[in-house]
């Protein structure tokens, strides 16, 4: 690796921090940068030595401290503008705690209310985080979700069809897409999409929460490919914890003369009866005492990313993706979600299957096991991208509604007493890890091999764990009985006349090599049968229902794992049940993605022939459902693809020409 990448890796706080788990001491291996970055010693040292000594409020420059603090904050804004190629027409606004705050700020500026809502439409992409869906939904505006195509990227034909349709209807059109998925890391061609948007008079808004720390952000790459707004969460950058959200947007979008958070710092003059807001959008939209140190830190993390270079990061991450697929594609127990050939960041969401039962290992169990065995900090769940997660898991709307039953409180007399509260254990999900570009090769290999090992043998440790059906949390049966003593607390701090006291020991580093940790984990997995002998889980707590809801239990439970372990002892090999469990959903795999959801020319032509006979295909767009392959029979699908009118006309024209030639030949 480059020396600068090694410098970053060495400066991460907690890089060698140890903790005690059920299988001994482990070192923190952080693989959750997609959720949040980690602080850097270099940046925090600069803030402690240079920023804090001169810290003051920025709403004046009359004193040395306020003047210096104002200078630091303006430097941060200027650095960010340069890093994103912002022009004079662009504003950089620090706001909220992340992308969510930035989106709310933009929505307020657009004045989406009253009659404007009825004539506005927002197109969201296939990968969207809830932060880029829910704020738009709550305005009452029409929302249309653009699907992905067979390559796993944005379906540009579908987007263009809708843009054409709503331009003719004279709608205000907003396209709010993610530059990269926080689930699969798959990238979107932001320039191509922006150019298409502007061709039809739409505004292009971009969520860079996942992509921002790694990809080049260019507000003005081409004359027509400019971005109207970008939302950012700098806390996801390495060194970024404790930074505000960022909204970078064209100044013309701020149509609302009243700022999103009016108050101190937003006005030029206030009388007893009137007030005058500031002309500067950046000042007017940052009401109250701003997040001063946080903004300065944001400028520093952008400065660091620019020093590394987006091209260096991209090359490093491409290499990480290649290594990951080389190892994991050989393991039949691992299903990596999303298209494997699409350009992506090294963000991987996966399912772990227990082959003999046909069930999955619960994502929270896998995450806990990676922590306990290897120290790997992963994340389980749906990554706050529910619609995309359901696409990837193969969960249609009907099945999703069936799962919703488990997440609602029940008061009916016919519901078992223990199940009246929501059962989050039943919520489908996946395990997500990401590999930061500055992680050294040895650690990358350690993480890849650890996941491969857990995927193959992790189920054997299920009997040693128990779950809370209401929260979905998993914990080791014996180790966590005294878990309260194993975490730090602010209540450890006390004060007396002499000063403050911290009544606990400082976290210590753990210097065992990665090879030693891997060997310890392997030994634990090899001894799983012996470790489970004293545990009787056959009559243990389990999820079970009296009706057809049992068919929705998709994960292997501890008592079931004990049964399979007993089978291994008796016959010296895994023994599958007579009937393998049929999962209530089928996750998308590359082979399944190529067979469904996207129309082929044969079905389009057949559909248009029927429409022509019924004389209804001349004015409206046609909804064409997917065909599994060019020669196969149609399949039932919940999703539809809109065929543009021009494409229909071309097909009809070709067919007419072909029929004319046949007619001439017959004559």
Which residues fall in each region the model found?
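Pyridoxal 5′-phosphate
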Residues: 1-615
């Amino acid at each position: 690796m480059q020396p600068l990448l090694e410098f970053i890796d060495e400066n991460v706080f907690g890089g060698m921090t140890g903790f005690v788990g059920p299988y001994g001491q482990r070192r923190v291996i952080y693989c959750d940068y997609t959720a949040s970055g980690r602080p850097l010693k270099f940046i925090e040292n600069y803030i402690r030595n240079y920023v804090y000594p001169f810290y003051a409020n920025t709403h004046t420059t009359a004193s040395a401290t306020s003047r210096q603090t104002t200078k630091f904050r303006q430097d941060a804004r200027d650095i960010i503008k340069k890093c994103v190629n912002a022009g004079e027409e662009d504003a950089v606004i620090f706001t909220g705690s992340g992308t969510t705050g930035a989106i709310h700020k933009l929505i307020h500026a657009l004045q989406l209310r009253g009659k404007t809502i009825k004539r506005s439409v927002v197109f969201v992409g296939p990968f969207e985080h809830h932060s880029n869906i829910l704020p738009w939904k709550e305005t009452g505006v029409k929302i249309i979700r653009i699907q992905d195509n067979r390559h796993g990227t944005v379906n540009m034909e579908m987007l263009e069809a809708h843009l054409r349709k709503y331009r003719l209807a004279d709608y205000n059109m907003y396209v709010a897409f993610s530059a990269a998925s926080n689930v699969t890391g798959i990238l979107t061609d932001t320039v191509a999409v922006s150019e298409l948007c502007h061709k039809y008079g739409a505004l292009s808004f971009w969520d860079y929460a996942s992509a921002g720390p790694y990809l080049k952000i260019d507000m003005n790459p081409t004359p027509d490919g400019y971005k109207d707004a970008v939302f950012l969460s700098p806390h996801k950058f390495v060194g970024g914890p404790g930074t505000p959200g960022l909204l970078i947007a064209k100044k013309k979008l701020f149509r609302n003369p009243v700022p999103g958070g009016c108050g101190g710092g937003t006005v030029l003059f206030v009388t007893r009866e009137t007030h005058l807001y500031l002309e500067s959008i950046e000042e007017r939209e940052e009401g109250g005492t701003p997040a001063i140190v946080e903004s300065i830190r944001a400028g520093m993390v952008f400065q660091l990313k620019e020093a590394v270079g987006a091209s260096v990061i991209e090359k490093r991450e491409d290499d990480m993706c290649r290594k990951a697929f080389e190892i994991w594609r050989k393991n039949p127990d691992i299903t990596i979600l999303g298209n494997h050939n699409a350009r992506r960041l090294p963000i991987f969401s996966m399912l772990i299957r227990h082959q003999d039962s046909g069930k999955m290992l619960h994502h929270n169990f896998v995450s806990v096991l990676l922590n306990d065995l290897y120290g790997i900090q992963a994340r389980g769940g749906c990554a706050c991208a529910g619609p995309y997660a359901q696409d990837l898991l193969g969960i249609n709307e009907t099945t999703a509604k069936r799962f919703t039953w488990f997440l609602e409180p029940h008061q009916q007399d016919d519901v078992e007493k223990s199940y009246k509260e929501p059962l989050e254990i039943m919520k489908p999900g996946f395990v997500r890890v990401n590999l930061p570009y500055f992680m050294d090769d040895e650690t990358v290999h350690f993480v890849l091999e650890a996941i491969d090992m857990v995927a193959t043998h992790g189920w054997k440790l299920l009997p040693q764990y128990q779950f809370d059906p209401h929260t979905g949390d998993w914990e080791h049966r014996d180790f966590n009985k005294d878990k309260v003593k194993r975490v730090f607390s602010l209540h450890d701090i006390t004060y007396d006349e002499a000063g403050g006291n911290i009544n606990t020991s400082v976290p210590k580093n753990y210097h065992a090599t990665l090879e030693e940790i891997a060997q310890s984990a392997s030994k634990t997995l090899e001894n799983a049968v012996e470790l489970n002998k004293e545990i009787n889980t056959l009559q243990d707590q389990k999820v079970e229902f009296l009706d057809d809801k049992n068919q929705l239990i998709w994960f292997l439970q501890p008592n079931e794992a004990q049964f399979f372990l007993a089978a291994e002892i008796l016959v010296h090999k895994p023994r599958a049940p007579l009937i393998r469990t049929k999962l209530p959903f089928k996750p998308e795999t590359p082979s399944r993605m190529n067979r469904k959801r996207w129309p082929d020319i044969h079905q389009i032509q057949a559909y248009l022939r029927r429409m022509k006979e019924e004389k209804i295909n001349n004015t409206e767009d046609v909804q064409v459902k997917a065909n599994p392959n060019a020669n196969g029979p149609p399949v039932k699908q919940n999703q539809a693809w809109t065929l543009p009118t021009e494409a229909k006309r071309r097909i009809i024209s070709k067919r007419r020409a072909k029929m004319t030639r046949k007619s001439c030949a017959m004559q």
